Amino acid sequence: MADVVYQAKLAVMRVLEKAPDAIGSVSSVATPQPHFVPTFDDGPTPGRTPDVMRALAAHDATATFFVLSTSVRANRSLLAELVAAGHEVGLHGTDHRHLSLMSPGEVRESVYAGKSELEDALGAPVRWFRPPYGDQTVSAWRQIEALGMQSVIWSSTSHDWNPFVDNDERVAKATAALKRGAIVLFHDGHASLPDGADDGPEPQLDRFDLVDRVLAGAAEQGLVGRSLGDALAAGGRLVTRAHFNLVPAPLNRRLIQRRRKATLARAAEAGLL
Protein backbone atom coordinates (compact mmCIF):
# COMPACT_ATOMS: atom_id res chain seq x y z
CA MET A 1 0.00 0.00 0.00
CA ALA A 2 2.82 2.38 0.86
CA ASP A 3 4.39 1.92 -2.58
CA VAL A 4 1.05 2.61 -4.29
CA VAL A 5 0.58 5.84 -2.32
CA TYR A 6 4.17 6.87 -2.99
CA GLN A 7 3.80 6.31 -6.74
CA ALA A 8 0.55 8.27 -6.76
CA LYS A 9 2.24 11.19 -5.02
CA LEU A 10 5.13 11.05 -7.48
CA ALA A 11 2.62 11.29 -10.33
CA VAL A 12 1.11 14.41 -8.76
CA MET A 13 4.60 15.84 -8.24
CA ARG A 14 5.34 15.42 -11.95
CA VAL A 15 2.22 17.43 -12.75
CA LEU A 16 3.27 20.15 -10.30
CA GLU A 17 6.70 20.32 -11.95
CA LYS A 18 4.83 21.79 -14.94
CA ALA A 19 2.78 24.17 -12.81
CA PRO A 20 2.87 27.95 -13.30
CA ASP A 21 5.89 29.86 -12.04
CA ALA A 22 3.70 31.55 -9.42
CA ILE A 23 3.95 28.52 -7.13
CA GLY A 24 7.56 27.65 -7.83
CA SER A 25 10.95 27.88 -6.15
CA VAL A 26 13.91 29.56 -7.81
CA SER A 27 15.85 26.91 -9.73
CA SER A 28 18.00 28.87 -12.18
CA VAL A 29 18.52 32.29 -13.76
CA ALA A 30 17.74 33.30 -17.33
CA THR A 31 20.61 35.63 -18.10
CA PRO A 32 22.21 37.27 -21.13
CA GLN A 33 25.52 37.20 -19.27
CA PRO A 34 27.97 34.25 -19.04
CA HIS A 35 27.02 33.71 -15.40
CA PHE A 36 26.22 30.72 -13.22
CA VAL A 37 25.37 30.87 -9.52
CA PRO A 38 27.56 29.01 -6.99
CA THR A 39 25.70 28.47 -3.70
CA PHE A 40 27.05 27.12 -0.41
CA ASP A 41 25.03 25.52 2.39
CA ASP A 42 25.47 24.74 6.10
CA GLY A 43 28.11 27.31 7.08
CA PRO A 44 29.77 29.49 8.00
CA THR A 45 32.42 27.07 9.24
CA PRO A 46 36.03 27.75 10.31
CA GLY A 47 38.51 25.88 8.14
CA ARG A 48 35.96 25.40 5.37
CA THR A 49 34.34 28.74 4.57
CA PRO A 50 37.74 30.51 4.34
CA ASP A 51 38.96 27.86 1.86
CA VAL A 52 35.87 28.38 -0.26
CA MET A 53 36.33 32.15 -0.14
CA ARG A 54 39.96 31.83 -1.28
CA ALA A 55 38.89 29.76 -4.28
CA LEU A 56 36.16 32.22 -5.20
CA ALA A 57 38.56 35.16 -4.89
CA ALA A 58 41.10 33.41 -7.12
CA HIS A 59 38.51 33.40 -9.91
CA ASP A 60 36.98 36.82 -9.18
CA ALA A 61 33.70 35.06 -8.42
CA THR A 62 30.89 35.83 -5.99
CA ALA A 63 28.46 33.35 -4.46
CA THR A 64 25.35 33.05 -2.32
CA PHE A 65 25.85 31.42 1.08
CA PHE A 66 22.84 29.81 2.76
CA VAL A 67 23.72 29.83 6.44
CA LEU A 68 22.40 28.00 9.49
CA SER A 69 21.58 29.96 12.64
CA THR A 70 23.43 27.30 14.64
CA SER A 71 26.59 28.09 12.65
CA VAL A 72 26.14 31.86 12.58
CA ARG A 73 25.91 32.08 16.38
CA ALA A 74 29.32 30.48 16.75
CA ASN A 75 30.97 32.24 13.80
CA ARG A 76 29.72 35.83 13.55
CA SER A 77 33.12 37.08 12.38
CA LEU A 78 33.06 34.69 9.42
CA LEU A 79 29.63 35.99 8.45
CA ALA A 80 31.04 39.51 8.43
CA GLU A 81 33.96 38.35 6.26
CA LEU A 82 31.56 36.88 3.71
CA VAL A 83 29.69 40.15 3.39
CA ALA A 84 32.90 42.21 3.27
CA ALA A 85 34.17 40.02 0.42
CA GLY A 86 31.08 40.86 -1.64
CA HIS A 87 29.20 37.60 -1.22
CA GLU A 88 25.48 37.28 -0.62
CA VAL A 89 23.90 35.65 2.43
CA GLY A 90 20.62 33.77 2.52
CA LEU A 91 18.98 31.65 5.22
CA HIS A 92 19.20 27.86 5.34
CA GLY A 93 17.29 27.59 8.61
CA THR A 94 17.59 27.87 12.35
CA ASP A 95 18.81 24.28 12.10
CA HIS A 96 18.84 21.46 9.52
CA ARG A 97 15.58 19.66 10.25
CA HIS A 98 13.35 18.47 7.41
CA LEU A 99 10.59 21.03 6.89
CA SER A 100 8.40 18.24 5.53
CA LEU A 101 8.35 16.66 9.01
CA MET A 102 7.17 19.89 10.67
CA SER A 103 3.68 21.36 10.99
CA PRO A 104 2.93 24.66 9.19
CA GLY A 105 3.07 26.44 12.55
CA GLU A 106 6.43 24.90 13.39
CA VAL A 107 7.79 25.87 9.99
CA ARG A 108 6.63 29.46 10.36
CA GLU A 109 8.03 29.76 13.89
CA SER A 110 11.39 28.25 12.93
CA VAL A 111 11.85 30.19 9.69
CA TYR A 112 10.72 33.46 11.29
CA ALA A 113 13.20 33.01 14.14
CA GLY A 114 16.04 32.26 11.73
CA LYS A 115 15.18 35.19 9.47
CA SER A 116 14.97 37.63 12.39
CA GLU A 117 18.25 36.44 13.89
CA LEU A 118 20.10 36.60 10.57
CA GLU A 119 18.74 40.04 9.70
CA ASP A 120 19.88 41.29 13.11
CA ALA A 121 23.36 39.88 12.44
CA LEU A 122 23.55 41.34 8.92
CA GLY A 123 21.74 44.60 9.55
CA ALA A 124 19.92 44.01 6.26
CA PRO A 125 16.86 42.15 4.93
CA VAL A 126 17.19 38.50 3.93
CA ARG A 127 15.59 37.67 0.59
CA TRP A 128 16.51 34.04 -0.07
CA PHE A 129 15.74 30.82 1.79
CA ARG A 130 16.96 27.34 0.94
CA PRO A 131 15.05 24.50 2.61
CA PRO A 132 17.36 21.96 4.29
CA TYR A 133 17.76 19.02 1.90
CA GLY A 134 15.68 21.05 -0.57
CA ASP A 135 12.78 19.37 1.23
CA GLN A 136 9.59 21.40 1.46
CA THR A 137 5.86 20.81 1.33
CA VAL A 138 3.43 23.19 -0.34
CA SER A 139 2.42 24.54 3.07
CA ALA A 140 6.07 25.07 4.05
CA TRP A 141 6.66 26.96 0.79
CA ARG A 142 3.67 29.17 1.57
CA GLN A 143 5.07 29.98 5.02
CA ILE A 144 8.43 30.95 3.47
CA GLU A 145 6.72 33.22 0.94
CA ALA A 146 4.48 34.74 3.62
CA LEU A 147 7.60 35.75 5.56
CA GLY A 148 8.85 37.74 2.58
CA MET A 149 11.46 35.32 1.28
CA GLN A 150 11.78 33.23 -1.87
CA SER A 151 12.65 29.55 -1.77
CA VAL A 152 15.78 28.68 -3.74
CA ILE A 153 16.67 25.15 -4.83
CA TRP A 154 19.34 24.21 -7.39
CA SER A 155 19.72 22.94 -10.94
CA SER A 156 22.94 20.95 -10.43
CA THR A 157 25.23 19.81 -7.64
CA SER A 158 28.93 19.47 -6.89
CA HIS A 159 28.27 16.17 -5.05
CA ASP A 160 30.36 17.44 -2.14
CA TRP A 161 27.70 16.05 0.23
CA ASN A 162 28.54 12.51 -0.92
CA PRO A 163 31.31 10.86 1.15
CA PHE A 164 31.58 7.94 -1.27
CA VAL A 165 33.13 9.80 -4.24
CA ASP A 166 36.39 11.71 -4.66
CA ASN A 167 37.07 15.20 -5.97
CA ASP A 168 37.94 13.98 -9.46
CA GLU A 169 34.45 12.51 -9.80
CA ARG A 170 32.85 15.55 -8.17
CA VAL A 171 34.60 17.95 -10.54
CA ALA A 172 33.77 15.86 -13.60
CA LYS A 173 30.08 15.68 -12.71
CA ALA A 174 29.80 19.32 -11.68
CA THR A 175 31.53 20.74 -14.75
CA ALA A 176 29.57 18.48 -17.09
CA ALA A 177 26.33 19.92 -15.70
CA LEU A 178 27.43 23.57 -15.84
CA LYS A 179 25.54 25.93 -18.08
CA ARG A 180 24.59 29.58 -18.25
CA GLY A 181 22.24 30.49 -15.41
CA ALA A 182 22.68 27.24 -13.47
CA ILE A 183 22.39 27.35 -9.68
CA VAL A 184 25.01 24.93 -8.35
CA LEU A 185 24.89 23.34 -4.90
CA PHE A 186 28.07 23.29 -2.80
CA HIS A 187 28.64 23.12 0.96
CA ASP A 188 30.97 25.04 3.26
CA GLY A 189 29.85 23.10 6.32
CA HIS A 190 28.32 19.82 7.48
CA ALA A 191 25.08 19.69 9.42
CA SER A 192 25.29 17.27 12.34
CA LEU A 193 23.35 16.24 15.44
CA PRO A 194 23.45 19.71 17.09
CA ASP A 195 21.87 21.05 13.88
CA GLY A 196 19.07 18.47 13.92
CA ALA A 197 20.72 16.29 11.25
CA ASP A 198 21.99 12.71 11.37
CA ASP A 199 23.20 12.01 7.86
CA GLY A 200 26.45 10.17 8.38
CA PRO A 201 30.06 11.32 8.35
CA GLU A 202 31.25 14.59 6.91
CA PRO A 203 32.84 14.00 3.50
CA GLN A 204 36.61 14.33 3.74
CA LEU A 205 37.58 16.57 0.87
CA ASP A 206 39.72 19.55 -0.05
CA ARG A 207 37.04 22.19 -0.54
CA PHE A 208 39.46 24.74 -1.99
CA ASP A 209 40.53 22.19 -4.59
CA LEU A 210 36.95 21.31 -5.50
CA VAL A 211 35.69 24.87 -5.86
CA ASP A 212 38.87 26.01 -7.62
CA ARG A 213 38.66 23.23 -10.20
CA VAL A 214 34.95 23.69 -10.84
CA LEU A 215 35.43 27.43 -11.33
CA ALA A 216 38.39 26.73 -13.64
CA GLY A 217 36.21 24.34 -15.62
CA ALA A 218 33.54 27.00 -15.80
CA ALA A 219 36.08 29.51 -17.12
CA GLU A 220 37.01 27.07 -19.89
CA GLN A 221 33.35 27.20 -20.90
CA GLY A 222 33.37 31.00 -20.76
CA LEU A 223 31.38 31.10 -17.50
CA VAL A 224 32.00 32.98 -14.27
CA GLY A 225 30.40 32.54 -10.86
CA ARG A 226 28.06 35.25 -9.60
CA SER A 227 25.84 35.40 -6.53
CA LEU A 228 22.12 35.25 -7.18
CA GLY A 229 21.78 38.95 -6.44
CA ASP A 230 24.69 39.85 -8.71
CA ALA A 231 23.29 37.72 -11.53
CA LEU A 232 19.96 39.53 -11.28
CA ALA A 233 21.64 42.94 -11.12
CA ALA A 234 23.41 42.11 -14.39
CA GLY A 235 20.10 41.60 -16.18
CA GLY A 236 19.16 38.09 -15.11
CA ARG A 237 15.62 36.88 -14.47
CA LEU A 238 14.56 34.28 -11.92
CA VAL A 239 13.39 30.94 -13.29
CA THR A 240 11.14 28.96 -10.97
CA ARG A 241 9.62 25.50 -10.87
CA ALA A 242 7.34 23.62 -8.50
CA HIS A 243 9.46 21.54 -6.14
CA PHE A 244 7.48 19.92 -3.33
CA ASN A 245 7.51 16.83 -1.17
CA LEU A 246 4.00 15.37 -1.52
CA VAL A 247 4.58 12.09 0.31
CA PRO A 248 2.17 11.63 3.26
CA ALA A 249 3.85 12.52 6.55
CA PRO A 250 3.94 9.03 8.15
CA LEU A 251 5.38 7.44 5.01
CA ASN A 252 7.72 10.38 4.49
CA ARG A 253 9.14 9.92 7.97
CA ARG A 254 9.75 6.21 7.35
CA LEU A 255 11.42 6.89 4.00
CA ILE A 256 13.75 9.49 5.53
CA GLN A 257 14.68 7.10 8.34
CA ARG A 258 15.29 4.31 5.84
CA ARG A 259 17.62 6.50 3.76
CA ARG A 260 19.54 7.55 6.87
CA LYS A 261 20.01 3.96 8.00
CA ALA A 262 21.20 2.94 4.54
CA THR A 263 23.72 5.79 4.42
CA LEU A 264 25.06 5.02 7.90
CA ALA A 265 25.34 1.31 7.09
CA ARG A 266 27.24 2.05 3.88
CA ALA A 267 29.53 4.47 5.72
CA ALA A 268 30.24 1.87 8.39
CA GLU A 269 31.00 -0.74 5.75
CA ALA A 270 33.40 1.69 4.06
CA GLY A 271 35.15 2.39 7.37
CA LEU A 272 34.04 6.02 7.44
CA LEU A 273 32.47 5.93 10.90
Residue ranges and their predicted role:
Residues 135, 141-177, 222-234, 251-255:
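His/Asp/Glu-enriched short active-site or ligand-binding loop at hydrolase and phosphoryl-transfer sites
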Residues 6-100, 106, 110-117, 124:
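Active-site beta->alpha N-cap acidic-glycine motif
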Residues 21-24, 49-50, 72-84, 134-141, ...:
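Alpha-helical scaffolding within the catalytic cores
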Residues 53-62, 88, 104-150, 170-189, ...:
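CE4/NodB-like, metal-dependent polysaccharide N-deacetylase domain
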Residues 97-102, 192-198:
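A short acidic, helix-capping loop that chelates divalent metal ions and anchors anionic groups
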